[in-house]
A protein has these predicted regions:
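ABC family nucleotide-binding domain
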Residues: 2-216
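H-loop (His-switch) and adjacent beta-strand-loop-beta switch element
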Residues: 213-226
């Protein structure tokens, strides 16, 4: 069976020459549909650069990336945009919510890009917010929500269009311990529902809660193990 994600000999080099930085240095990795994976590394390890590649937010200098059987290098900008809008739900450490929109409006945003009508958008966004326990906060703007609630809005936004892949970059990095548990439980439920969930993190406590841990250091994958 073809892996959902297949990366082979990927390089990303900044400042080529004497002072070059190999953010990704000959990285190869396969991830199958339905896996729950953490990509773990300290600051500067290359993990965020790798996330940008997996999310089709940036392009490597060399190497191959096949997503769902398609060579990403051969896709047009419109096709890449379509992947980001239909196949991948992004969750970021900084929430990235629009301050002047309420929770419902923030979750509706990716649905606008999909061309859905207003009523359909509201129904889907409302359902997504209910799934993350914010059915009573739909009309609240980000500054009226706690950090944990803001991240739950971000999760709802990521899952509203029902993408098969969830790509979460340090999703608990700005949260207290209670909110961290809540977000991880939501991500676990998303995995149980059949989605492929990939978490980028520096935190071993987060990594211990997933099925597979890929460690990256100095742009290289140094270990790939299954949690028992």
């Amino acid at each position: 069976m073809e892996p959902l994600i297949r990366v082979k000999n990927m390089y990303k080099i900044y400042n080529p020459g004497e002072n070059e930085v190999r953010a990704l240095d000959d990285v190869s990795l396969e991830i199958n549909q339905g896996e729950f994976v953490a990509i773990v590394g300290h600051s500067g390890s290359g993990k965020s650069t790798f996330m940008n590649m997996l999310g089709c937010l940036d392009t490597p200098d060399s190497g191959e990336y096949f997503l769902d059987g398609k060579d990403v290098a051969n896709l047009s900008d419109n096709e890449l945009s379509d992947i980001r809008n239909h196949k991948i739900g992004f969750i970021f450490q900084g929430f990235n919510l629009i301050p002047n929109l309420d929770a419902l409006g923030n979750v509706e945003l990716p649905l606008i890009y999909r061309g859905l009508g207003k009523q359909q958008r509201k129904e889907i966004a409302g359902e997504a917010l209910s799934k993350v326990g914010l059915e009573n906060r739909m009309d609240h703007k980000p500054n009226q929500l706690s950090g944990g609630q803001q991240q739950r809005v971000a999760v709802a936004r990521a899952i509203a269009a029902q993408p098969p892949i969830i790509l979460a970059d340090e999703p608990t990095g700005n949260l207290d311990s209670k909110s961290t548990i809540e977000i991880m439980n939501i991500l676990k439920d998303l995995h149980k529902s059949g989605r492929t969930v990939i978490i980028i993190t520096h935190d071993d406590e987060i990594a211990n809660q997933v099925d597979r841990v890929v460690r990256i250091m100095d742009g290289k994958i140094v270990s790939d193990s299954v949690n028992q």
